[in-house]
Amino acid sequence: MGELNIRVTGMTCASCVASVESIVSNLEGIDSVRVNLPLEKATIRWSEGANEDLGVVRDAISKGGFGSEKYVDPKKYRKESLENANRMGLQVIISLILTIPTFFLTMFVGDLGQIYDLDSRLLIAFILSSIVYFYAGIEFHKGAWQAILSGRANMDVLVHIGTTTAMIWSSFVVFSPYLDFLPSVFSSTAHVFFDGAAFIISFILLGNWLEARAKLRATDAVFSLMDLKAKTGSIVNADGSVSEVPVEEILRGTEILVKVGQTVPLDGIIVKGSASIDMSMMTGESNPVFVTENDSVMGGTIVLDSAIHIKSTKYHDDTVLANVINLVDEAQMGKAPIQKLVDRISAVFVPVVVACAVLASLTWMFFSEGHGDYNSTELAIMVLVSTLVIACPCALGLATPTALIVGTGVGAQYGLLIKGIDALQNSYNTNTLVLDKTGTLTVGAPSITNIKSINSDENNILEIAASLESASTHPIAKAISQAHLENSEKLISFDRIENIGGMGLVGYLEDQEYAIGNQPLMERKGVLVSNYIEELADVLSISTVVFVSKGKKLLGWIEMKDKLRETTNLAISKAKELGLEVIMLTGDRAETALTISKEVGILRFEAEVKPDGKAEFVKKLQSEGAIVAMIGDGINDAAALAVADVGIAMGAGSDIALEAADIVLLRDDLLDVVSTLELGKATMGKIRGNLAWAFVYNLIGIPLAMGVLISSTGWLLPPAFAAGAMALSSVCVVFNSLTLRSWKPFRA
C-alpha cells in the first residue's frame, strides 16, 4: 500500500478541502486521502496492488480548479507562502487607502457637482472601488470562476457574487442618466454600495493576510526542528585526515569529528573525547548534558566546549531528529473525529448559503416595503450581499488543523512527540494513569546493596547470576553484570538459557540446572526459600531480592535497590491535580510495592505483575470504564502500550518505542508525562473551542444578515460589517490556536 504527499494550491476554505478529498477519493485505486488546509498538503494512500499514478491524481485535481505538485521541499513552500503574504499585505494597504475615501464619498460627502451629467461624487467612488474590485479582489474572482467552471463552490464564490452584485447595482445607479432602458429603481438618487463592495474585499483580504501570517507562525516549531539538521559532517578518513561531506553520503559506522559549536550531524556513539551537549532544541532540556566515551548522542544537538569523535549509528533519514520531524508531520495531517462532521457540512455549506441569501433577498424584495431610506429592491440587495459575505467556511476549515499544528509543534520543541490526533483526543479524555515502576517511577538503574550466601561464596553467586543474566536486557541484569565485571570478566558458558516471563532465568549446564529469579520461580523449581522470607521481611519492603539456586539448593540471594526519579513525587502530585487516578504496576512483591507507593503518594498499585499481565491489567481497567494512559519504556511494555488508550514511551528514542507508543518522550522525566497529557487537553480544548466558535458564528451571523431582526428591532447588518465579521471569524480561530505557542511544560 503506497503513500504519497502532494502540495495542493488554490484552497481557501473547508469547502475546498472537501472538494479535493472528494475528487481524489473518487479515483480508482485510492484507499484514503487527507488534506490539510494550512499546510496546503494532501496525503494519498493507494489500495493494495493499485496503479500508483501521480499524473492521474494531478490531472483530476487540476480539473477541479486547483494546482498540485509532489510535496518535496516544505522550506521552499514556506518561502513562497511568505512571499504571497507580503504581496497580500501590499494589496491590503492599497485597498484600504482606496476604500476609506470611497466610504466617506458614499456616506458623508455632499454634492460635488456633475461631470457629463453624472454625479461626480458617485463617479469618483465608482473609480476608486473599481480599482479595489479588480486589483485587490482579483484572486477572489479568479478563484470563484475556477470553482464555478469545475462545478464546485467555495468562499471565493460567496465573495465574488456578493461584491459583483453590489458593484453592478451601484454602477447602474451611477450611469443611469445614459441608460434609459433601466427601470426607475436605478435612478441617480438610489443608494449605492461601492463602499460595501470595497470594504468586503478590503476586510476579507486583511483577514486573509492576518491568517496567512498566523499560519506561518503556527508552523514555526516544525521548521525550527528542520533547521537543526546539519547539512554536512566532518568524516575521519583512514589516514587520519578529515573531509567535509554531505550528511546524505555518511554511512553507518563512519567516524565523525564534531568540533566546538558544531551540530552533531547524525546519531552516534562517542568513541573519543567528552563534552557538554546542548539538547535544548531537541528535548527542551535547558541545562547542558555531559557526555563521554560510549555515551550516545543525537543528531541536531550542539557540542559546547570540547571536540568529540563519534561513530554514526543511523543514516540521515533514520535519526531521532528525522523520526521526530516525520512524527510531527504525520500528526499534523490528522483529523479529529468531529472534523468528519465538519467535512460533511463544508461540502454543502456554500450552496446552502447561496440558496439562503437568494431566498431572503427575494422575500424582502417582494414581501416588504423596504426599510428606512432603502426601498425593497435596495434592501434585497443589502440582504443578499451581507448573507453571502458573512458566511465563513474558512473558520470551519482552520479550526482543527491550526490547533493541531501548533500543539504538536510546541510539544516537539520540548521533546514531547505526539503521533496523531487520536492520541490527543484520548489524552484529553484520560482519567487513569498507569505507571510501570522500574524505569518510570525509578531511574531504572538498580544497584546491588548486599549479596547473601547460603551454600556458596559471594563471588560464585555473582558469577552464576551474571552468566545467567547475560541473556537479558532487564535493568536488574545490567546491574548484576556491571557488578560482576568490577571483579572478574569470567562467565559460565551455559548450554542453554531459558527466560521464564515475570519470574527470572534458568540455565542448563551438563545436566545441572541453575536459576535466578523471584520466590515463585524458586518454588516452581522446588527450591525452599520460605524459611528465609521472615528474615528478609524488612529488606523486601524497600528492596528487590533475586534468589540464585543450583538444582534444588538455594545458593543465596542478591539485594538490590533502585532510586526514585527526582521528579517522581512532583509528577504524581501534578497528575492528581489534573484529576487523574494514578496506579503503579510492578513485578515486585506487595511489600516493596506498598513501601514505594506510600513514598510517592500513590494510593493504588498492582504487585507481582508479569510482563504479559500488564496488558491484561490495562484491559481490565478499560472494561471498568477507565480511559487509560500507560507509561513504560517502550520495549518491555510494548503490549501494554499498544492496548492502552494512550501509550506513552518515556525517555526513548528507540525504534520499538516509536512503533509501540502513541506518544514518545525524549527526556527521562516523569513530569513530561503529565505535561504531555496537559498539552493534549489544552490542544483539544482549542480545537473544540475553535469549532464551537465557527459553528456559533455562522449559526448567528447568517440569520442576522438575512434580516431576522429587521421587523422586530429595525436593525439591519450592513455588507461592510458582514465582511468585517467574516474576516474576524477566521482570524480569531487562528489566533486562538496560536495562544498554544505560549504553553510551557512542567519543570522541577
Question: Where are the predicted features?
Answer:
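Conserved ATP-binding TGD loop and adjacent catalytic N/P-domain core of P-type ATPases
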Residues: 1-2, 18, 509-511, 544, ...
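Flexible metal-binding regulatory segments at protein termini and peripheral loops
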Residues: 1-122, 134, 241-242, 322, ...
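Conserved cytosolic catalytic loops of P-type ATPases
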Residues: 28-47, 55-59, 191-192, 223-318, ...
